[in-house]
Amino acid sequence: MPGTNGRVIPDNLPSTATQPPLVIETRGLKKTFLSKIAVPVLHGVDLQIRSGEFVAIVGQSGSGKSTLLNILGALDVPTAGTVRINDVDIATLSEDELALLRSDEIGFIFQFHHLLDEFTCLENALMPITIRYGEETAAQRARVISLLQRVGLGDQWHKRPNEMSGGQNQRCAIVRALANAPKIVLADEPTGNLDRHSGEEVFALMREMNRDSGAAFVMVTHDDRLAQAAGRILLIENGVRRELGRAEHRARTRSADGSRGEAF
């Protein structure tokens, strides 16, 4: 194909126009914790995550996985480097603007569901909307009820957390994370407090919601089976990020201590 200056441009060059938009980008991300001595955790992490991706972050305990997730969620600040969320450098935002960013653009799922015992499942799921807007609209309420029905809680939404199982509570937490229709969902060991069967069910729901919502999901996990089912696998090792293919991840798992699901 001829270019504007008469040169021939190959037709098979990769096109960025067809790629989903970047929702997370970090450059030179560093984090050092200061106590009696400086403890460096992240050493110049460069990362790009696009809308609709499902990314698993693996690594040994203490490698910085959760620290990275907290920085991506604007819950912590890096020592150096930049974080862009939906093309906004979050270092330029005020505290109020950061709070709005977290409310509007990012959903969080934690290992422990953190549902409030005094509220019903529906009220807990609506909590991000209530905090953001003061009161939900009929359309927002209907959407959240629809999500609860889709995750199998259509007949449970009136119950309180202590009346539901751990898996049901975590399903409610997934709906809560999606309540404000965020572009990014960050999950820190979302199945770590569940038995294997419940964990696999919760993960399957997360994958389904990822596909249907188009939100980018970023999940920290020690479960190599779940990491294998993600779209991408990122290893945090010695404070550095490295992309792992599935074959390499399986090989690392087999060469670990022999335990299944706890290799990272």
Segments from the language model and where they lie:
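ABC-family P-loop ATPase nucleotide-binding domain
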Residues: M1-K31, R242-F264
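ABC family nucleotide-binding domain
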Residues: P21-N238
